[in-house]
Amino acid sequence: QAETPTYHLDQELRSFANYANFKPTIGSVTDEARMRQIFSTYRPELVLHAAAYKHVPLMEHYPEESIHTNVLGTKNMADLSAFYQVEKFVFVSTDKAVNPTNVMGATKRAAEMYVQSFNEYLETNHTKFHTKFITTRFGNVLGSNGSVVPLFKKQLANGGPLTVTHPDITRYFMTIPEACQLVLEAGIMGNGGEVYVFDMGSPVKIVDLAKRMIELSGKKVGEDIEIQFTGLREGEKLYEELLNDH
């Protein structure tokens, strides 16, 4: 549904002569009729489902939209994948789905539960071929749209300050290539029902990341560029977890 990122991806892929056999298609996962048309036309063997609303504070104000896209949109894609006998369905989830404290995390957890339950139902009730549903959980992807690094870069370019919500807030990070690798490996290795979590090492304090970026820009923390603490936003955790308590 995001037209501009789709356009940029189209342009990037067209620069690779050996990878010209693709067709960008605009549509929303919440539009079941449109998605059915796409499945019927292209008959995919693999579905990588990454469509979601992801910004925690924004979704606190629009829970109905988060449910519509993150839960019902995922249900549409999962149901159609099973109907059109897709071989594997990889659902891209988030560490915010673990013991969720906000709307976005709760909707992603609900979507995880649907995908896993659907896989179990198909395994139990269909002895012949059925779609295998696999889940991957991401931390924060460095450099992705709306992530903290591009924000800090913009704030640095404007002379600061760099805004951090809390001095103790930490996050897990992974790079874009690592995120892509996790999704592709899950699609290859998964046999249905698994939840794959990438080893992202130790969590990073956001204030330390801010200090490091200031130093890398050749500036001094507190002299040239200030760090400003703005307070935790609605639904925001001090730290994220990778695995559920249960």
What is each stretch, according to the model?
Residues 128, 151-174, 178, 182-206, ...:
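A conserved pocket-lining segment of Rossmann-fold NAD(P)-dependent short-chain dehydrogenase/reductase
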Residues 24, 66, 89, 133-136, ...:
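Hydrophobic/aromatic anchor residues within beta-strands of the central parallel beta-sheet
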Residues 189-246:
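Mid/C-terminal beta-alpha module of Rossmann-like enzyme folds, strongest
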Residues 29-68:
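NAD(P)H-binding glycine-rich loop region in Rossmannoid oxidoreductase-like domains
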